[in-house]
């Protein structure tokens, strides 16, 4: 899957999520970083994600209102789950039901690292 210009939700803002955001931004994706913890500091998160590439970044923290969640899920091309995020959350089940591909960090690195075969 080409990542450029895809809308990708990175679920979890820990070290893995920050690294995923950096890679996706470098590849030109439209990135939404989501973490259910509303006590996190948005500026601190931003300071850990280097700005590079042609991608864009939006950060969502805390519980998503149903309308916001539905709007977001309609527009996603891909979800990258951080390893610490439980895979049985209702929103994750909803993503599966909608057929949105859900990758881990290893799948993302594999796809991004693919080169052209000569």
Give names to the regions the model predicted.
Residues 1-104, 108:
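N-terminal leader/targeting and accessory segments in enzymes
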């Amino acid at each position: 899957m080409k990542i450029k210009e895809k809308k990708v939700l990175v679920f979890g803002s820990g070290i893995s999520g920050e690294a995923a955001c950096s890679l996706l931004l470098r590849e030109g994706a439209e990135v939404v970083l989501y973490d259910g913890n509303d006590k996190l500091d948005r500026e601190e998160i931003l300071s850990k994600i280097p700005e590079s590439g042609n991608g864009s970044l939006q950060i969502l923290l805390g519980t998503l209102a149903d309308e916001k969640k539905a709007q977001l899920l309609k527009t996603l091309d891909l979800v990258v789950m951080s390893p610490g995020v439980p895979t049985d959350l209702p929103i994750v089940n909803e993503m599966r039901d909608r057929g949105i591909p859900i990758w881990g960090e290893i799948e993302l690195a594999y796809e991004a690292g693919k080169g052209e075969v000569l």
